[in-house]
Curated annotation (Swiss-Prot):
Belongs to the bacterial ribosomal protein bS6 family. CDD domains: bS6. Coiled coil: none annotated. It comes from Borreliella burgdorferi (strain ATCC 35210 / DSM 4680 / CIP 102532 / B31) (Borrelia burgdorferi). The gene is rpsF. Pfam families: Ribosomal_S6. It comes from the Bacteria. This is Small ribosomal subunit protein bS6. InterPro entries: Ribosomal_bS6, Ribosomal_bS6_sf, Ribosomal_S6_plastid/chlpt, Transl_elong_EF1B/ribsomal_bS6. The keyword Coiled coil does not apply. Residues 130-139 have a biased composition (Polar residues). Residues 120-139 are annotated as: Disordered. The keyword Membrane does not apply.
Length: 139
């Protein structure tokens, strides 16, 4: 059965190593019959802790469709790529969104979050008192 996957890859930060490793990943995807491959470069960031003696890394997210039984072989191929520091592959669940429920829920949240005290206070009109409120400039 063909499923939709989303994979996040962390590569070494050097430009040449990154491009070479990314091409290896894409060739592996083609080899294992992945379709609808969409690549998205996230950026280069500092890592919280060193991974394989690297302090920075480049993130890439790739979405693809593939047979479920090819995924294990694909993961074993990923482990052989030297400049790939980490990867994570998730099954992307596509759900039909019911907009009526969302609209109802948003309205309920809005209704429940209204500060009733501020509404009561806003309806009152303060009448000015004191001599400065009744003074009108005369010519």
């Amino acid at each position: 059965m063909i499923k939709r996957y989303e994979a996040c890859f962390l590569f070494k930060s050097e430009e040449i190593e990154y491009k070479g490793s990314l091409e290896e990943v894409k060739k592996s995807l083609e080899f294992f019959g992945a379709t609808d491959v969409v690549s998205n470069f996230i950026g280069e960031r500092a890592l919280e802790y060193p991974i394989k003696k690297q302090a920075r890394g480049r993130y890439e997210i790739i979405e693809f469709s593939m047979e479920g039984n090819n995924l294990k072989e694909f993961e074993s191929r990923l482990k052989l790529i030297r400049n790939l520091l980490r990867y994570m592959i998730l099954v992307k669940i596509v759900r039909k969104i019911n907009t009526k429920k969302i609209k109802r829920r948003n309205f309920r949240e809005f209704r429940d979050n209204i500060d009733k005290d501020s509404l009561k206070g806003a309806s009152k009109v303060e009448t000015p008192t004191g001599p400065e409120s009744t003074d009108i400039q005369e010519k």
